[in-house]
Amino acid sequence: MEIQGLTIAYKQKVAIDNVTLQIASGKLTGIVGPNGAGKSTLLKGMMGLIPREQGQVTLADKPLTYWRKKIAYVPQRSEVDLTFPITVFDMVLLGTYPALGLIKRPGKKEKQLALDALEQVEMTGFMKRQIGELSGGQLQRVFIARALAQHAEIFFLDEPFAGIDMTSEALIMRLLKKLRDNGKTIVVVHHDFHKVAAYFDDIILLNKKLVAHGPVEQTFTEEKIQFAYGDAPVAFAAGV
């Protein structure tokens, strides 16, 4: 996946400034940086969910939007209307819709895919619950299950571990590593850099501009972290 000269602005204020990099296929890549660095903006800009001032994102010489059916997106929980009357099962079943098109309805095959995904995240016992009744960790598992049901090749996750329990975080991380081991490409916006070395193969260190990008052991150094975070107090955690 190639990002070339990506610039994004809100109300004429630059949020992402001329970012160019390549994201390796079959890797777990983390987007890391201080608050306000543009991490979520970069993720959404890559997917074409928000307007770009300039730049392009391509995969195999085609715009990334061309591969939309092969891309799964897990948004921040705050972006989801938890009052919407949908059950856990139906939420996960939505993951099968991109492959169905506009007319075809989900059948036995799709329902089994949803059940299999719920089993992987250990949420089958909650399938009839309304999503607003779930805890943060349970809800995040459901979002992951929806992505699994899609059978995507590329997974974008925006702060999937924020405000969830450790059991859910460990389960989700195991699933992401399993997907990576099966050749999937995974990009995660992440805020807890104490776990960066344990979670990711590569990182994108960002503060509106690209600070560094590459394998964790080469990129996640004290010097580069301090450059990205500036005067903000940062406890160096590479290798933890």
From Swiss-Prot:
Q: Give the UniProt entry's GO cellular component terms.
A: ATP-binding cassette (ABC) transporter complex
Keyword NAD found = no
Which superkingdom, per the lineage? Bacteria
**Membrane topology, record value:** Peripheral membrane protein
A Pfam family: ABC_tran
The entry sums up its family as follows:
Belongs to the ABC transporter superfamily.
Q: What is this protein called?
A: Manganese transport system ATP-binding protein MntB
Organism equals: Listeria monocytogenes serovar 1/2a (strain ATCC BAA-679 / EGD-e)
